[in-house]
Amino acid sequence: MSDTPAERALIIDDGSPCALVATLLEQAPEGITLWSMGAGDARASASRRRVALLGLAGVERIDAAMGLDDERTAGVESARLLLAAGAAAIRLGAARLVWPVALGDDLRAMGAAADRVRAVERLLDLETDPDTKPLRFDLPLLDLTLEQVADLAIDLDAPAEGAWWCEHEGAGPCGACPSCESWQRALQQARFGVAGTRAKAGA
């Protein structure tokens, strides 16, 4: 076993299946901290469960409101999110910042996300100590669709209790909000049940 410390990384975490899959793709979970931006206790609880299930370094909860649902300002708010997460990653001594967005069905959005990351990287580089090692940005799911992310969840035996895809609070996902509808469709196509198990053959 190597004595080399695990590389530290910060994952922007909204509690979604995308964040869960991105976490599972990491090779050294003990070096991973979740930057929990999930609004509501259900998403935050999913993040805490993931820390316990996967042996992660910890979770940081942020309270800053982000207007990501408003199309008029979503791009600006995404940039603000990345800048705040980048500052947090540098403060924690992380080498990488992981942004688990899946935009594979929207080429324009993919390009905008990549441009946004480059702009934030440049700004962080300009505004941090010159002796600080540049922060690396990682978008491991960028060119995937939600259905492909769901397929990955199956391949990785993802524990569904480590994610929360509903826009509302409750004992379980409501099944009716836009987020639930999108993820239910993707998960059903991938045969990934809400309990986190594969559907039986022929079911």
Where would I find each of the regions flagged by the language model?
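ATP-dependent adenylation/nucleotidyltransferase module used to activate substrates
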Residues: 1-157
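General N-terminal targeting signals
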Residues: 26-28, 154, 183, 191, ...
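Short cysteine/histidine-rich metal-coordination sites, predominantly Zn2+-binding motifs
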Residues: 169-170, 191-203
